[in-house]
UniProtKB/Swiss-Prot annotation:
TM ranges: none
Pfam family, one: Ribosomal_L17
Alphabetical list of PROSITE patterns matching this protein: RIBOSOMAL_L17
Superkingdom of the source species: Bacteria
Organism: Marinobacter nauticus (strain ATCC 700491 / DSM 11845 / VT8)
Designated name of the protein: Large ribosomal subunit protein bL17
Length: 132
């Protein structure tokens, strides 16, 4: 019985699941916007948000812990140099999940996962202010 077992399996082995979310998190940190299925997006939140919280406190130990979870030097550097300071005043809720229809092949629900307050959002808000 699976009573009270949290997390989705996605019909993958634990190593495959771990690698998938490691890669998705690194891509999210690098590009700040990714498109994936809705269940994967919801599960990605559980992996990515604690890493951003970790990046708020820049230390060698925290960088090593983040690297052990991401295995990407570029992602860790961006996480601590850009994202940590950006969200230093925000108490969680760093990701936004936007539903974007269904995939053509199998009708799977798709979603965009983006970082809240990413630079393109700020530029769009400034453009809206200029129009008014």
């Amino acid at each position: 019985m699976r009573h009270r077992k949290s997390g989705r399996k996605f019909n993958r082995t634990s190593a495959h699941r771990k690698a998938m979310f490691r890669n998705m998190t690194a891509s999210l940190v690098e590009h700040e916007l990714i498109k994936t299925t809705l269940p994967k997006a919801k599960e990605l939140r559980r992996v990515a948000e604690p890493l951003i919280t970790l990046a708020k406190n820049d230390s060698v130990a925290n960088r090593r812990l983040a690297f052990s979870r991401l295995r990407s030097d570029a992602a860790v550097a961006k996480l601590f140099d850009e994202l940590g300071p950006r969200y230093s005043e925000r108490p969680g809720g760093y990701l936004r999940i936007l539903k974007c229809g269904f995939r053509a092949g199998d009708n799977a629900p798709m979603a965009f996962v983006e970082l809240v307050g990413r630079p393109l959002d700020i530029e769009a808000e400034e453009m809206d202010d200029d129009e008014e």
